[in-house]
């Protein structure tokens, strides 16, 4: 140990250690091998530095980071005699592959030996059978014929051996054809790995690639599964027949037929004899059962997929001249009812409905609708109107009318979707045969839709139309029922038709030329087909002009010879002075500014409009200004704001309800989400207002009403009816089921908004020209419907015909279209007996089309 301490430190500055050599190392150096490789960079110390008994040892590099000095660079030694991980992996799978390949080879050799053994035994059996036949022949024949029989036997030996070789070859081929796929699928990964040298990058195995290709083939191509099943069946028949040919004495054709019978019917193998034929027959029958199980599965899946496609509405609608409805809303039921009534005269029709809903849900909702379709069939399909493929699925290019329903919810979003739907419809390559009727939610967006759709589009601004209609009905009680009769197809509606026999006739004479219709206007051909409502009596019909009439159906009227009608004069010239009115709005609508503008144009000066809702006053003014209303420019009305809840009695009692001429209960869209909830709120407000009004009636009126005994069982209804004679209340009703409640109580002249919009959509869908007529009747300017008192046209007890009153109304530039008797509940539009004379009462009222005052 003292010798080691004498080693100079300066000679090992590079972390090189020197070990002394023990004596037994020097004595037997060959007996112990070196544990470390010799470092080529070892620096030998000078021999003079060490004593004579000390031997210089080699330096060894350890796996430590060398500390380099300023004069020396670090040296890195690479050890390369250890095998890499890649080489070990290659050796592992090569050894496994060799072992498994050897096992497969031994199996094949064993099978071949068995096959050869079987062949040898079969040849021995054939030889023994030949010897038996020869001995039997020798016993029967004389000795002279032995040579000939021997020659005959020698001639037959060669064909028998050839036949045996063929059968053995067939048996061998059948086994090989069964083993080859197994070997390929078993060792295909090793083949793919053998192509990888030392590349350690990740690659997909060939087995997975083949499985992926098969999966793509089966999923992409529609006839892939039946084709695979057919190929599997043919392979089973071929392999089975080939195997039967090897184990039986039948020819190949008969063996193939037997194989088919085993595949087709698993019970046919019961007649097989022998171990070999029975094993093969059982195997073929088992494969046949699998084949038929797969076939039944494919057939069942195909049938289920087809029924599922039909159930979910994925199949194509092969129809022509049908009505197509895109979208789903609460108006669909009323719309289907009106279209079914319109198609009744044609023997029924076809209506296709496509919406982004499940087909079963749509059919279930339509099945719950309580009306008769009258021979019209409704077909539902699931899809989006924004996708051209879904539009083609409902034969959009062959439809005679396309109706686009507005969505429930935000008006701008609904109109934006309608705009995109129109863009999709105009992008159909085949073109459109019919016109497009679009239900709009906001009047400001109507221009954009017409700009995109062009001449193909007809718009019905539902919300604004209902608002203006409510104002008309509020100022003229009973007008709501008249609008329902005219817009619906159940009674009389508008029709336009050309009658060449009327050319050259004055419009005054045309008015009394139709016994079953009432002319209302002329479609002037010289004006580009413009419809003129209520033209002058002196207008002469020209060639190409068409007559606008109100009739029960398009085939129920025709011109007749002119009747003899006595012309009279009006009793006196009535001029109704306008008096200020007080109107109350309960609730809030998004088109409030439009309703205020219409009221300001129709009411007398110094009129008042009270707005009662839960919207703060500052927010109301902001909404009205944003809608384009300048409150300072209102000429005839002044706004009175009251804040409160319309379903709270205490808030309603703070209003002078008995002093209003008209009360409009609006469906408050900001509060309620569904039609039923909105109607419930409107109905509650209506009953509260009528009850408050009835309690504020004078005592004398209530006493006289009670003494009459008319309402002994329901005095509250009688009191409300008494109050309704003073104030007209119009309720905006969204759900048609609420109609019966209000009609039974008779306490409100209701407006069924959704049903009226559906009627307008159906009418424009059947004839797009009617849209111009409706737009003028609903607009601020032009003509409108009015209810007139009878004393304007006749005297008390005067006997006149309907035609005579019509000619008197023409002196006021009005077109008489119907009447309502004093003791009747409903008006009669387009009465049948127009020439029959009868006595009239001054309490009767007449319905006319006249210019707006």
UniProtKB/Swiss-Prot annotation:
It holds the Pfam family Castor_Poll_mid. One of its GO terms (biological process) is monoatomic ion transmembrane transport. It comes from the Eukaryota. The keyword Protease does not apply. Expressed in infected and uninfected roots, leaves, seed pods, and flower buds. GO terms for cellular component: nuclear membrane. Residues 38-51 have a biased composition (Polar residues). PROSITE patterns: RCK_N. SUPFAM superfamilies: Voltage-gated potassium channels. Residues 1-55 are annotated as: Disordered. The chain crosses the membrane at residues 96-116, 168-188, 227-247, 279-299. Residues 117-137 form a coiled coil. Belongs to the castor/pollux (TC 1.A.1.23) family. This is Ion channel CASTOR. It comes from Lotus japonicus. The lineage of its organism: Eukaryota, Viridiplantae, Streptophyta, Embryophyta, Tracheophyta.
